[in-house]
A protein has these predicted regions:
Chain A
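C-terminal scaffold of the Radical SAM
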Residues: 1, 22-44, 95-125, 139-379
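N-terminal [4Fe-4S]-dependent radical SAM core
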Residues: 1-4, 414
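Local cysteine-cluster metal-coordination motifs and their immediate loop/turn environment
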Residues: 9-20
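Short hydrophobic targeting helices and cationic amphipathic motifs
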Residues: 49, 53, 62-65, 72-75, ...
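Glycine-biased, low-complexity coil/linker segments
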Residues: 51-55, 60, 127-135
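Short amphipathic alpha-helical interaction segments
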Residues: 379-391
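A short, conserved structural fragment
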Residues: 394-403
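Short, amphipathic alpha-helical interaction segments positioned at domain boundaries
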Residues: 412-425
C-alpha cells in the first residue's frame, strides 16, 4: 500500500455541483467519527483481505510494483531528499507513503480533532515504522489536507503545520465572487487569497488550488484573472476541473441559463492549458498542472493503478488487486467502522490490465508503457489492449512513442470515448 | 344488403325447418356425430379463453389456470392474439344421449391474416361468432362474419364476457341484428371466464352445425389449413378430409406441385398429436409424411391421391403475397451467418414469411423480409430477437411499388434503394387497400382528420346503429404501415377497429428521398414519399436523426436529397467536451463503470463510414410519422 486516504464527510453548506458524500450540520459527530476512523485503521487489514493480503505480501512480486522512483521520473529537479525518503519508505508494503485528507471539508475538523486523528493514525498498524508522535507526519513522503478558504483559521493552519503536513490543497474554485456565489460556495475570493497567503507565511512550500471551468457566467477574462492571481502568488500546483452536472445535484436539477456551453468550456480549457504551460507548469494529468517536482504523488498513485486504503464513510480502497468501498453512511460508520464494505470488486486480469491502461493514459507526460503493462499482467492479458491502442494511434487519438502511448493533447477534452475504446472494443 | 338477405334466408331455413327435426335427420355414413367448427371474433374478444374452457369441460385438459392452451407462443399470449391456427378434437356427450366428436379449428385473430382465416373456415361447417359484451361488434367481428357467411357456414352468435359489470348485452344483440342481420335474440350468453353458458353452447353446436358431407369411398381430397415443422417428422400439415380416407402407408400428392409423399403417420389433435389408424372423410387431423422442405406445403392447398391426379383442388387456393417489406441486418456484420440460421429455422414455423438476401452499402449483408402486414412484421421481428437472441437493425418498412419506366416496362420494387434512376421512371404506382374503420360516432371527426393526413379517400360512411359509424376508405398501404394503426387507436381512445382488403395499384407523384450522413448515402434510410410531403418528411427525419446520433469527434452534416438536390439539412456539431475529471478520492470503479457504459453503448452502434449511428436511428424510423 502506498496511499492512505481519509474521507471527512462534513460540510457547512453544500455546493450546488457537489455529489460527494458529505453531511451538513453534523459537526457534533466529528469526535465519534474520528474515533471510528482510528478503529477502522486499527483493524487493518480488513478481515476479508487478511489471508489474501498476507499471502500477497509474503510473495511480494517486485515486478508487480512499479519502481519506487517512478513518481519522480518526469521531474528531474525534484528535491533529492523527497526522492530518497520515498525510496526508503517504499520497502514496507503495509504502511503508507502518502496521506491525503479529503472531503467534505477536512478543515472543519479543527485543531483538536485533527491532532487526535493524526496521532492515532501514527500509532496504528498502518503507520510507517518507528515514527515518533512529535515528528508528526513529516517523514511521510507527501501528506496533503484539503482546506476550504472559509475554515482556514490561522491557528488551524498552524496545527496542520505542526502535525507535519507538507502539502495543502485549497478549494478555491474561482476568484470571482459572482461565480462562487452562483454555485453556493460560502467563501469570497479575498478569503481564499488570504488563506493561501497565511499558509505561505507559515512556510508551506507545496500548495495546490482547485479551479472549476464552466461555472455559470464564466468567461476567459474572469478565468484568466483567477489563474493569473494564483500563479503570481507562487502556488505550485493547480487542479482544473470541468464542471460536471451530476445527477441529483441542485445544479443538474436547475441548471442556470448562463452555464457555459461545451464549446466554451473546451475553449476555456485550451486557454488555461496554454497559459499554465507558458508559466512553467507541466500538464501531467488531464486535470492537473504542477511546477516541476510538485506533481501530487498521492494522486499519481491512483493513476498508476497503485494500491491505497481509504478510511471513512464512502471511502474507496484498492488493495491486493481488489477495489472496494465503504457505505456512504456516517451513522452506520460510527457504529461499526469495520463492517462498512459496500462492495468488493473482483476483476479478471484482463479487466485489471484494461483499467490500468485507461488510468495511465490520463498521465499525459508519462503515458502508458505497454512493456511494463505486459510485465505486470502477462502478455496474453494485454494483447487485445495493445491492438486497440494501436488502432487508436492510427486514428490519431493516441500518440505512439516506442512501446509507450500517450493521449493526443488536442483530444484531452474528448478523452472519454477514447478511454471507452481502450477498455473494450 | 345482398349478403344479409342471403344470411337471413339461410338462418331461417336452418332454424325453422331443420332444428326441430335435427335428431331425426339421418345422414349417410358415420359422419353424423362429427361437428367441425371454429370460433371467430375481433381481437381480444375472448376467443382463446373460450377455447380453453371448452377443452377443460370436455376433459381434454385438466386445469388451465392462466394458460391459454391454443396460444402456445409466449408472444401471442403477451399480445393477446393468436397468430397460428391450431385445432383440437373433443369428445362430447350431448343431452340427446349421443356421443359426438367436436373439432375446434382455431383461427388467427388479426387483420393481417385474412387468407389464413378464410382457409380455416373452409375446414368447418359452423362458426361460433364471439362478441365481447363490453365492446360490442367491431371491425373484425364483421369482417370475419362475412368470411364465414361467404364460406357457407352456420353461424352461432355468442355474446361473451357477460360477467363484466359493463356488459351491454342488449346493445350487442341490436348490433348483431343491425350490422350483420343476425337475429340478435338468438345469441347465446356466455362467460368463457367462469364457464357460464358454455354447456348450452356445446348443445347449440351439436344441434345447429351441420355434420360434414362427403364419402370415404370417393377419391382422397383434403384441405391443408395449417402446418407446423417438427424436427424429426418434417412438415406436418393440418388437414380436413372432404372425401376418401388416409392411413399409414398411403401415398399422397400435393395438388399444386404434384409432389408425392408416403404417409408415415396420421392422427388427431388432442391437443397434442395422437396417432390413429386411419382418418376418414369429415374428420380433422394431421398427416406426417416426412416432408422436409418447408416451402412445399402451403395453406389452402389440397392433398389428393396420386391414383386420382384428376381430383380437383379445393377452390380459393393462392400463394400468399406479402404486403410489407423491410430489411434486417445484424448489428455486428460477423453475425450474418447466425442470422441466416435463425431465419431458416424461423421460416419452418411461419411459412408466410419470405426472405431473400440483400446487401446495403451502409449496413452490409442482411435480408429483405416480406410480411403479411404491419403487425405480422412487428411480431416476427420481436420473435426473431427473442427466440434467437439476435440484435437486429430493421429498416423502414416499405410496400411494393409498381415502377413504370420510360421504355414502357414495369417492375415491382419492394426496396426504395432499388428504384431506378428518376430520369428513367415514367410513373410510379402504389398499392391501395380498402379500409373499413369501425368507430363510435364521437370519434368520426378525429379519425377523418387523421385519415385525410394519410391521403385516404373516403368512399362511404355507414351508421350500423346510432352510436357507431363505419368509414370506408381507399387507403394507401404505405400510409398504413407507417403508424396509422397506432394513431387510429390513440385518437379513438382504443375504440376504433379496422379491417382491410387489397384493392389495386393507383398512380401517384412519388419521389425517392435519400439520406446522407457525412456525405455517405445510407441506403437503408432511403424512403419513398409523395412529392408534396417529401420535404416535410425529410425535415422531420433529419431532425430526429440529429437527436439520435451522438456528437462525435468531427462535424456530421445530415442531408436529405431527391436525386442530386438537397431538400433538408442539419449538422451535428463536433463533440467538444466529454472528459472525466475529479477522481473522487480514488473511486476508480465509478470512473471505469462510466466508461464501460460508454463502451457498451458503442457496441450497439453501426458504423456508417466513419460515423457511429445508433441502432435506434434505424428503429425509430419505423415509426417515423410525426
Amino acid at each position: 500500500m502506498k496511499g492512505l486516504y481519509v474521507h471527512v464527510p462534513f460540510c457547512v453548506s453544500k455546493c450546488a455541483y457537489c455529489d460527494f458524500y458529505s453531511l451538513l450540520g453534523r459537526q457534533d459527530s466529528i469526535e465519534s467519527y474520528v474515533q471510528s476512523v482510528l478503529r477502522e485503521a486499527g483493524a487493518y487489514p480488513p478481515s476479508f483481505l487478511r489471508r489474501d493480503l498476507k499471502g500477497e505480501l509474503s510473495r511480494q512480486n517486485p515486478s508487480i510494483q512499479p519502481p519506487a522512483n517512478e513518481a519522480l521520473e518526469d521531474f528531474p529537479s525534484a528535491a533529492d531528499s523527497r526522492q530518497s525518503t520515498y525510496k526508503k519508505t517504499s520497502e514496507s508494503a503495509q504502511t503508507f507513503q502518502t496521506l491525503y485528507l479529503g472531503g467534505g471539508t477536512p478543515s472543519l475538523l479543527g485543531p483538536q480533532n485533527l491532532t487526535t486523528l493524526i496521532h492515532g493514525l501514527l500509532v496504528s498498524p498502518l503507520a510507517p515504522c518507528g515514527r515518533e508522535l512529535e515528528r508528526g507526519v513529516t517523514s511521510v513522503v507527501e501528506s496533503t489536507i484539503e482546506i476550504n478558504p472559509e475554515s482556514a483559521a490561522p491557528e488551524f493552519l498552524q496545527t496542520v503545520k505542526n502535525l507535519g503536513f507538507n502539502r495543502l490543497s485549497f478549494g478555491v474554485q474561482s476568484l470571482s465572487d459572482c461565480e462562487l456565489k452562483s454555485v453556493g460556495r460560502i467563501h469570497t475570493s479575498a478569503q481564499a487569497v488570504a488563506a493561501i497567503k497565511q499558509a505561505q507565511k507559515l512556510g508551506f512550500k507545496n500548495i495546490s488550488a482547485d479551479l472549476i471551468i464552466g461555472l455559470p457566467g464564466q468567461t476567459w477574462t474572469s478565468l484568466y484573472a483567477s489563474l493569473e492571481t494564483l500563479v503570481k502568488m507562487g502556488i505550485q500546483h493547480l487542479s482544473v476541473y470541468c464542471l460536471a452536472l451530476e445527477e441529483g445535484t441542485p445544479l443538474a436539477e436547475n441548471p442556470p441559463a448562463d452555464l457555459p456551453s461545451d464549446e466554451l468550456q473546451a475553449h476555456l480549457f485550451e486557454e488555461t492549458r496554454a497559459y499554465l504551460i507558458s508559466k512553467g507548469f507541466v500538464h501531467y494529468e488531464i486535470s492537473n498542472f504542477a511546477l516541476p517536482g510538485f506533481a501530487c504523488l498521492h494522486n499519481l498513485n491512483y493513476w498508476r493503478g497503485g494500491e491505497y486504503l481509504g478510511l471513512g464513510p464512502a471511502a474507496a480502497s484498492h488493495l491486493a488487486g481488489q477495489r472496494f468501498k465503504n457505505y456512504p453512511n456516517l451513522d452506520s460508520y460510527i457504529a461499526d467502522p469495520t463492517g462498512q464494505i459496500e462492495y468488493i470488486e473482483e476483476l479478471s486480469k484482463k479487466e485489471k490490465a484494461a483499467e490500468e491502461a485507461m488510468l495511465r493514459l490520463r498521465l499525459l507526460k508519462e503515458g502508458l508503457d505497454t512493456i511494463a503493462l505486459a510485465q505486470k499482467f502477462g502478455t496474453d492479458n494485454v494483447e487485445d489492449i495493445i491492438t486497440r491502442l494501436q488502432k487508436l494511434s492510427q486514428e490519431g487519438l493516441l500518440v505512439k512513442d516506442g512501446s509507450r502511448f500517450r493521449l493526443t493533447p488536442s483530444r484531452i477534452m474528448t478523452s472519454n470515448p477514447i478511454f471507452a475504446r481502450v477498455i473494450a472494443e | 344488403m345482398k349478403i344479409h338477405e342471403k344470411f337471413e334466408n339461410y338462418c331461417q331455413s336452418i332454424r325453422l325447418f331443420l332444428v326441430p327435426f335435427a335428431p331425426l335427420v339421418i345422414l349417410f355414413r358415420c359422419m353424423e356425430n362429427i361437428r367441425n367448427f371454429c370460433i371467430i371474433a375481433h381481437i381480444d374478444h375472448g376467443k382463446s379463453t373460450l377455447a380453453d374452457r371448452m377443452l377443460e369441460m370436455t376433459g381434454m385438459i385438466h386445469t388451465t389456470e392462466n394458460a391459454q392452451v391454443l396460444d402456445s407462443m409466449d408472444l401471442e399470449r403477451e399480445r393477446g392474439i393468436t397468430i397460428k391456427a391450431k385445432s383440437v378434437r373433443m369428445p362430447f356427450k350431448s343431452q340427446d344421449g349421443k356421443d359426438y366428436i367436436l373439432n375446434l379449428i382455431d383461427t388467427p385473430g388479426h387483420v393481417d391474416f385474412n387468407y389464413e382465416v378464410s382457409r380455416s373456415l373452409k375446414a368447418c361447417e359452423g362458426a361460433v361468432l364471439l362478441v365481447d359484451a363490453s365492446q360490442g361488434v367491431e371491425a373484425q367481428t364483421i369482417a370475419n362474419a362475412y368470411l364465414a357467411i361467404d364460406a357457407g357456414l352456420e353461424i352461432i352468435p355468442v355474446i361473451n364476457k357477460i360477467d363484466l359489470p359493463n356488459a351491454m348485452v342488449e346493445e350487442c344483440r341490436q348490433q348483431l341484428q343491425d350490422s350483420l342481420g343476425i337475429p340478435g335474440k338468438s345469441a347465446l350468453l356466455v362467460s368463457a371466464k367462469d364457464g357460464t353458458g358454455v354447456s348450452e353452447l356445446f348443445e347449440a353446436i351439436v344441434m345447429l352445425v351441420p355434420p360434414p358431407k362427403g364419402s370415404s369411398d370417393e377419391p382422397l381430397k383434403c384441405l391443408i389449413f395449417d402446418s407446423f415443422y417438427d424436427t424429426y417428422r418434417g412438415v406436418i400439415p393440418h388437414i380436413r378430409i372432404f372425401s376418401g380416407s388416409l392411413k399409414h402407408g398411403d401415398k399422397i400428392m400435393i395438388k399444386s406441385t404434384g409432389q408425392i409423399h408416403d404417409v408415415d403417420e396420421v392422427g388427431y389433435f388432442t391437443p397434442g398429436l395422437t396417432p390413429t389408424g386411419q382418418i376418414t372423410a369429415g374428420e380433422v387431423g394431421y398427416v406426417g409424411a416426412i416432408i422436409k422442405k418447408v416451402g412445399s406445403i402451403h395453406v389452402g392447398d389440397t392433398i389428393i391421391s396420386p391414383e386420382h391426379p384428376e381430383t380437383e383442388g379445393i377452390p380459393g387456393f393462392r400463394h400468399t403475397q406479402p404486403m410489407v417489406f423491410c430489411g434486417i441486418y445484424p448489428i455486428n456484420t460477423n453475425d450474418y451467418i447466425k442470422l441466416t440460421a435463425a431465419l431458416e429455422k424461423f421460416q419452418l414455423n411461419d411459412s408466410s414469411i419470405i426472405y431473400e438476401k440483400e446487401s446495403s452499402a451502409a449496413l452490409g449483408w442482411g435480408y429483405r423480409l416480406g410480411f403479411m402486414g404491419m403487425l405480422h412484421m412487428e411480431i416476427t421481428l420481436e420473435r426473431l430477437k427473442r427466440e434467437y437472441g439476435q440484435e437486429l437493425i430493421a429498416t423502414m418498412p416499405s410496400v411494393i411499388y409498381k415502377v413504370v419506366t420510360t421504355d414502357g416496362q414495369f417492375a415491382m420494387i419492394d426496396n426504395p434503394s432499388k428504384f431506378p434512376d428518376p430520369t428513367r421512371i415514367d410513373h410510379i404506382e402504389e398499392p391501395i387497400i380498402t379500409l373499413r374503420v369501425f368507430v363510435p360516432t364521437e370519434f368520426v371527426g378525429p379519425i377523418m382528420a387523421l385519415s385525410d393526413e394519410k391521403r385516404a379517400k373516403l368512399v362511404a360512411m355507414d351508421h350500423p346503429d346510432k352510436k357507431r359509424a363505419v368509414l370506408t376508405y381507399e387507403f394507401p398501404l404505405a400510409e398504413m404501415i407507417t403508424g396509422y394503426y397506432d394513431k387510429l387507436k390513440s385518437v379513438s381512445r382504443g375504440y376504433a377497429s379496422m379491417d382491410y382488403d387489397f384493392l389495386g395499384y393507383h398512380a401517384g407523384d412519388f419521389v425517392k428521398v435519400d439520406i446522407l450522413v457525412k456525405e455517405n448515402q445510407v441506403d437503408a434510410l432511403s424512403f419513398i414519399s409523395i412529392r408534396e410531403s417529401s420535404q416535410t418528411k425529410s425535415r422531420g427525419l433529419i431532425h430526429k436523426l440529429r437527436k439520435l446520433i451522438p456528437r462525435q469527434n468531427f462535424e456530421i452534416p445530415l442531408q436529405a436529397a431527391i436525386g442530386g438536390k438537397i431538400i433538408a439539412r442539419e449538422d451535428i456539431v463536433a463533440l467538444r467536451k466529454d472528459v472525466l475529471a475529479k477522481c473522487y478520492g480514488g473511486d476508480i470503479t465509478r470512473k471505469r463503470k462510466l466508461l464501460e457504459k460508454q463502451a457498451e453503448g458503442k457496441k450497439k452502434m453501426k458504423m456508417v463510414g466513419s460515423v457511429e449511428v445508433p441502432q435506434e436511428a434505424f428503429l425509430l424510423l419505423l415509426k417515423m410519422e410525426e
